[in-house]
Amino acid sequence: MLVTGLEILRKARAEGYGVGAFNTNNMEFTQAILEAAEEMKSPVILALSEGAMKYGGRALTRMVVALAQEARVPVAVHLDHGSSYESVLKALREGFTSVMIDKSHEDFETNVRETKRVVEAAHAVGVTVEAELGRLAGIEEHVAVDEKDALLTNPEEARIFMERTGADYLAVAIGTSHGAYKGKGRPFIDHPRLARIAKLVPAPLVLHGASAVPQELVERFRAAGGEIGEASGIHPEDIKKAISLGIAKINTDTDLRLAFTALVRETLGKNPKEFDPRKYLGPAREAVKEVVKSRMELFGSVGRA
């Protein structure tokens, strides 16, 4: 069933579990995510980026919305990292039930203004909104920000931001980063900062860049001929602790891509004469489903539908 993001996430934060937001780019990813959700009886969020929407066009967005409507568990269709008001309006027209406006690279006042504009438009049609807030290193309005605080969310600013914008859930910058880590040192979550934010912001909180990047997946990808540098993700125990502190939505993309691509490579490597797409996309779809199921177990969303 198709529901708003807030319907899923408000319950998750109140009851202390997390819900996965899994990025999809095609039919196989969408099917894998929804099949996993139904098998695990878990709510889920299908996330589409602007890049995915450009790649698949209206055929993709209509398919994702239609499959979400048919699902036997609560599903939100979410715009991931919407860069503009126009991008959000496009998602609203396509039937999305959750949208993100990401103006975190702008100054605080611009972020507030642009986010509030999106909130007003989305709420007018019953759609809920995710916003993002971070800090840049340097000095702004006589406030010095140390390098260790660069890009990290300021708890008091988060409270003010949510009060002024009316956003429904907030993506916080607490140390994670998008994609697989390559030469950036061990990824981390600033749990004390998260705890301070959660005390001031009662809304559901969102963790981006939360893929685990399991070494077995990395090695399987390499063994099948893939090339990837040193890569690591967020430790499962760090994710669990973050959920206990108020994180309700956890984004995952890299792990799904690794699993899917590794299986396609493996299948074609073992069967070089194969040219039936179903024979290599099918196993890849199953690999994605298994990753999604394991993430749902980690997040504690199993049986919560």
From Swiss-Prot:
Q: Please tell me whether the keyword Zinc is annotated for this protein.
A: yes
List positions binding dihydroxyacetone phosphate.
G179, G209, A210, S211, N251, T252, D253, T254
One molecular function GO term is: zinc ion binding
Ranked from the top, the taxonomy reads: Bacteria, Thermotogati, Deinococcota, Deinococci, Thermales
EC number of the protein: 4.1.2.13
Q: What is this protein called?
A: Fructose-bisphosphate aldolase
Q: Per the record, what are the reactions this protein catalyses?
A: beta-D-fructose 1,6-bisphosphate = D-glyceraldehyde 3-phosphate + dihydroxyacetone phosphate
Family the entry assigns: Belongs to the class II fructose-bisphosphate aldolase family.
Sequence positions that bind Zn(2+) 2: D102, E132
Catalytic residues (positions) = D80 (proton donor)
Q: Which interval of the chain is the signal sequence?
A: none
- In the record's cofactor note, how is the cofactor described as bound? Binds 2 Zn(2+) ions per subunit. One is catalytic and the other provides a structural contribution.
Isomerase listed as a keyword: no
> Which coenzyme or cofactor does it need?
Zn(2+)
Q: Where does Zn(2+) 1 bind?
A: H81, H178, H208
- Residues noted as binding D-glyceraldehyde 3-phosphate in the record, renumbered to the chain: S49
Q: In which pathway does it act?
A: Carbohydrate degradation; glycolysis; D-glyceraldehyde 3-phosphate and glycerone phosphate from D-glucose: step 4/4
Q: Which GO terms describe its biological process?
A: fructose 1,6-bisphosphate metabolic process; glycolytic process
Q: How does it assemble?
A: Homotetramer.
Q: What does the function comment of this entry state? A: Catalyzes the aldol condensation of dihydroxyacetone phosphate (DHAP or glycerone-phosphate) with glyceraldehyde 3-phosphate (G3P) to form fructose 1,6-bisphosphate (FBP) in gluconeogenesis and the reverse reaction in glycolysis.
